[in-house]
Amino acid sequence: MYKRQDVYLPCATQNELDLDGVKTLIANGCKYIVEGANMPTTREATDYAMANGVLFLPGKASNAGGVATSALEMSQNSQRLSWTSEEVDAKLHQIMVDIYAKISDAAKRYDMPDNFVVGANIAGFEKVVDAMMAQGIV
């Protein structure tokens, strides 16, 4: 499981990647961890990876494609549209590019460039605040 690799994509169960695992990954040259599931990395492993120069993308951002695609499907259905797979892929690509831009920008605004955990948390919070303000809740 932990042979030499540049990128590790934990995509199975919650907490599958723990501190011992991330230490082994780093020792084997891992530079990027991109979560593809809901919280597959323990907090200790996440903190250790980031403290050791691994670029870490949390699942709340990197795993958003499935939810986004479901929203695109619901949009098609409600409007009685039929998009080609290429059109869906293009829309999804733009959504993911926008997510990256938002989390990267949020991290930079708080002087934590490349800390995508902080960026994702801040960007997510800002999105909720904006929605609440738009609805007059706040």
Q: Over which residues does each language-model region extend?
A:
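Short, well-ordered coil/turn residues at beta-beta hairpins
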Residues: 9-11, 36
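Adenosine-phosphate binding glycine-rich loop
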Residues: 26-138
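Beta-loop-alpha module in the N-terminal Rossmann-like domain of NAD(P)-dependent dehydrogenases
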Residues: 12-21, 40-42
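Aromatic-enriched hydrophobic runs in primary sequence
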Residues: 3, 19-20, 125, 131
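Conserved small/polar residues in nucleotide/adenosyl-binding loops
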Residues: 1-8
